[in-house]
Amino acid sequence: MDINQMTYAVQGALQKAVAYSKEYELQNIEVEALLKAAMNENDSLFKSILERANIDVDQLIKAYDNQLSHYPTVQGDNVQYGQYISAKTNELLDKAEKYMKSYEDEFISMEHILRAAIDTDETTQKWVGNKVEVIKEIITKVRGGNHVTSQNPEVNYEALEKYGRDLVEEVRQGKMDPVIGRDEEIRNTIRILSRKTKNNPVLIGEPGVGKTAIVEGLAQRIVRKDVPESLLDKTIFELDLSALVAGAKYRGEFEERLKAVLKEVKESEGRIILFIDEIHMLVGAGKTDGAMDAGNMLKPMLARGELHCIGATTLNEYREYIEKDSALERRFQKVGVSEPDVEDTISILRGLKERYEVYHGVRIQDRALVAAAELSDRYITDRFLPDKAIDLVDQACATIRTEMGSNPTELDQVNRRVMQLEIEESALKNESDNASKHRLEELQEELSNEKEKQSSLKSRVEQEKEKIAKVQEKRAELDSSRQALEDAQTEGNLEKAAELQYGTIPQLEKELQEFEEAFQDETGEDSERMIREVVSDEEIGDIVSQWTGIPVSKLVETEREKLLSLSDILHKRVVGQDKAVDLVSDAVVRARAGIKDPNRPIGSFLFLGPTGVGKTELAKSLASSLFDSEKHMIRIDMSEYMEKHAVSRLIGAPPGYVGHDEGGQLTEAVRRNPYSVILLDEVEKAHSDVFNVLLQILDEGRLTDSKGRSVDFKNTIIIMTSNIGSQVLLENVKDAGEISDDTEKAVMDSLHAYFKPEILNRMDDIVLFKPLSVNDMSMIVDKILTQLNMRLLDQHISIEVTEEAKKWLGEEAYEPQFGARPLKRFVQRQIETPIARMMIKESLPEGTIIKVDLNDNKELDFKVVKPTS
């Protein structure tokens, strides 16, 4: 027997049989060892055929094991197990060779071994029984008229079932979600499929717009017989390219698998339509030196009309792969799939609603579907409808489902309190003093009350869970009845269809409504229930906020108070600039209330004024107030953009330049944090061409980066600071700190001389910051000293400065042209440095108070008050 005349699967089985011989200490390879090995081969054809014939393969393997354990064993140091083939095994292989010749094959394959085993092995005969003819029919069907001409023939057997899935069959089994809309694209696809030649549509559209759904919709129409007569008997197979490539170890194996698939499609004489998702992957697939890629293998069949093929790919990949191969491109007919609008998306979500309700066991409100479509369209800008809206609904349902599976917060708190009291009770029982006994009595009373409350809550939760389970059961029953109705209508079983449509389904709908109403009456409104089972627009808003960081969920009371007092919070940090603070806080309130222009940033401001008056501080304060951290501020120092070419750093380097893959500093920061404060500091230091980039941001709220991606700035606050006109402000400010009209005009003239009108015209407001007065300085002193006290808090030391000393600090450090910065330096010299020396010189105990006062010589005195022990 020549081992080279066997397929790889049979050779592998023989090698495994040697291992089994060693396991059972047998010198010969017995027939049972070979057959057991044939069963346990990867993707075993031997096992697959027996399973189809309804033979219990696990019991058969046990029977082989039992038989092997009865053979005489050989033991010793130099025994080579499985070195020889037994007479029975030899007889089986001879018989298999005869079957090979009768099938006109070139190699002994697994089906020959199976036929030989049925003829020669008693154990196999006993288990197969009277199913020999059934097995013969299965073998004929599996081979599909193919001959074994290679050592890997299994790839040619039932190739479509191995490397594809039948979409029409999945629709019949109710495994597919309904497809809503897309009628025009489906009709277009049907027209192209009905052509004589080049009847191959390719669906082109952005990721997530529903290309695959169009093919699923066509499969559903075929099942419903809602297609032209020429397509009624068709079936759609989706080709799994990854399965086609996976495990193709030898050169030419991939091509062999693809040829087997194409052969089956061709032999179906147009009955099979092949759907290839991500069709661009075929171009270059399997390409090695001197080999042909998969795309070239398809071309002849596509041109002759022997292969009905539907492709799907994205616009970018079509351009990159398919358009480059013009011979392949001309064999396909393009069908554009555009993104549906919000109204169409809402219709799609309404069609899918029931499926998601049954799957998650929740109830989805209609306003949740509307919110999912609208919020995803507005805030999730880097993905496409309807995919992103469906994802939102799915995530919200999963969130509610997770909550339903765990204890409600109220019950969880009571459980923890009961456990805490029980631990305390067991500890107090060991004490004998009166105080402990008295506490034990109080505790036992409290524990009794808590346990009663726990029992009541548990009972409520169980009742609600029971009711929800009943509602879920009815929903699932109704869904399966509707699927059965579709099947009955498709099969033409009118009696069953009538019974379902006019009897079963209305009855189930009535029962479901009664259950839901009873549940509503018993448990009250949704807000009063222990367990939430309703998905509302609030849950959708929460998910959008999680994904994007943009607060779109309903305002909670604490946030309302925070927004209404935003102006006061900012006033505490920014001294003397009331107009600027009010303008910025008003813009935030408008945005959070949802009445701002949805196509522009929340606000865009240009802050003008001398150095050190609070322009940058206001931007920091705003970021800190909105996000509880200054880190959410995107700060760009425009002094770094003095050259003309530096604009590429904002939006990313052009293709071909170093750093193209890294993206721009501004665009990447906003893509990661779409809800943020953007501070463009010292804008007059930048090159004038840099401002051209800002035009689209200020007007349309978007910017296209170097990779062609549109970045959304609609949820940002843009603040620019500049010192233009600061000299005019310093020279002409009134005593009360007010800015006169003439001064304002002079500053604006300076501004117009530097900035182009189209930039200034797009800004919401230009705010003039007035120079700080002496009164402002005393307030800033308070702020600086508060910050110092916060830093000393870790060391449990505090300072107290008298009003006289504070006034002196403010007056001495007052320099109008430099703002508040000199004051900071003055406080460092006059207060921080002496305190630091005192702390190093003598160790100050915790609780020490350092009192600072002004003496007669106009110098600061420091008095250390140590805590009394």
Swiss-Prot record:
SMART domains cross-referenced by the UniProt entry: AAA, ClpB_D2-small
Region named Disordered: 442-465
GO MF, any single term: ATP hydrolysis activity
GO cellular component, one term: cytoplasm
Region (NBD1): 158-339
Coiled coil: 390-524
Domain of life of the source: Bacteria
Chain segments carrying region Repeat 1: 6-71
Localization annotation: Cytoplasm
Keyword Coiled coil recorded: yes
GO biological process, one term: protein refolding
Repeat 2: region residues: 85-145
Keyword Transport (UniProt): no
Chain segments carrying region NBD2: 559-771
Binding, ATP 1: 205-212
Keywords of the record: ATP-binding, Chaperone, Coiled coil, Cytoplasm, Nucleotide-binding, Repeat, Stress response
Record note on quaternary structure: Homohexamer. The oligomerization is ATP-dependent.
Family that this chain belongs to: Belongs to the ClpA/ClpB family.
Known function: Part of a stress-induced multi-chaperone system, it is involved in the recovery of the cell from heat-induced damage, in cooperation with DnaK, DnaJ and GrpE. Acts before DnaK, in the processing of protein aggregates. Protein binding stimulates the ATPase activity; ATP hydrolysis unfolds the denatured protein aggregates, which probably helps expose new hydrophobic binding sites on the surface of ClpB-bound aggregates, contributing to the solubilization and refolding of denatured protein aggregates by DnaK.
Domain remark in the UniProt entry: The Clp repeat (R) domain probably functions as a substrate-discriminating domain, recruiting aggregated proteins to the ClpB hexamer and/or stabilizing bound proteins. The NBD2 domain is responsible for oligomerization, whereas the NBD1 domain stabilizes the hexamer probably in an ATP-dependent manner. The movement of the coiled-coil domain is essential for ClpB ability to rescue proteins from an aggregated state, probably by pulling apart large aggregated proteins, which are bound between the coiled-coils motifs of adjacent ClpB subunits in the functional hexamer.
Protein's name in the database: Chaperone protein ClpB
